[in-house]
Amino acid sequence: MVGALAYAWSDTFWFSAVEGEVYAYSSFCTALVFWLILKWESVADLPHANRYIILIAYIIGVSIAVHLLNLLCIPAIVLVYYYRKYKNTDLKGSLIALLVSFVLIVLLLYGLVPGFVEVASWVELLFVNVFHLPFNSGVVFYFFLIVGVIAWAIYETYAQRSDKLIKISFLISIVLVGIPFIGDGYIIGIVLTAALAYYLFTRKKLAVVAMNTILLSLFVIFIGYSSYALIVIRSTANTPMDQNSPEDIFSLGGYLNREQYGDRPLFYGQTFPAEIARDANGTAISTKGKAIWKKKLKTSEDEADRYIAVSYTHLRAHETL
C-alpha cells in the first residue's frame, strides 16, 4: 500500500506513463521485481522459496529487452537477501553484499547481454565461412546447443550422479551464455573461464542448491532475453523505420551495443579541439577495432553463403591529448 501510494503521487512515474516510451513498462518491471524479493523474504525459510528468485531472474531477462534500468534493483535485492539469510549482519557484511551486487550487474550488463550475441556470432561465422553452411545455421545450432546444455546441467544438479558431471555441465553453461567474455576479444573470457574452472574443481564440497538456482535463473533469463528476436523479425520485414537493419546476428550485436551512437572518452583521452596525430610522413595514425561482418552478395546461384569483413569498429585517427 505504501509503495502504491508513493507511485500515485510520483510526478516521474505519471510523466513516464503518458509518453510513448519504454519507461512506464520499465518502472512496472522494477516495482514487480522489488515486490517479489519482499515476497521471498516473507517465505525464505519455507521449501521452494527460491521460485521467487527464479521469477525475479525471468522478469530481469524480460526487462533487459525493455530498458536496462531494471538492473539497478540488483543491489537492493542482494541486500534484502543478505539481511534475511544472515543473522549476524554488520557494516562489513553490507559492503561485501553491495560489492557482490555490483559484480552481478557487471556480469549481466557487460557479460551476459553482449556475450550471448558475441558467442553466437562466433558460431555463426564458423558454420558459414568454415563449414560452408547456409546463413543463420550457426545461430540455430547455438540456440539448440545452449538450451540442451543448460537443461543437461539442471538435470545433473537434480540427479547428483557425479560431482564431476555437475562441475563440467555448469562450467560449459556459463561459457556458452557468454558471461566470461567481457569486452572485446577473448583474452578476458579465457582468464575468467580458467578462474571459474579452478574454483569449481578445487572445491571439495559443492553448493548444489545454489548452482541449481543459478542455472535455472540463467535459463529463464535466456527465455526473457529471447524477446530480442522480435527485432530481427521486424527488420527482416523491411519496415520504413529500420535503424541499423539488424537482420543477422552481427548487425544485431551492433544494434544492442548501440554502436550507431558512437562513444567518447569520459575520464581519459582526446578532447573536442584535439588535432589528429600523424607520423613523420604526415599520414594520420589510425586504430582498427574488431571486424564488422556482412553477408557477401552472390555473383551466381551456385556460390556458397559467406560473410565478409566490410569495415572495422572504432576505425578512427589517433588524436593528440
What is the predicted function of each stretch?
Residues 33-52, 79-90, 151-165:
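Membrane-interface transmembrane helices that cradle and orient dolichyl/undecaprenyl
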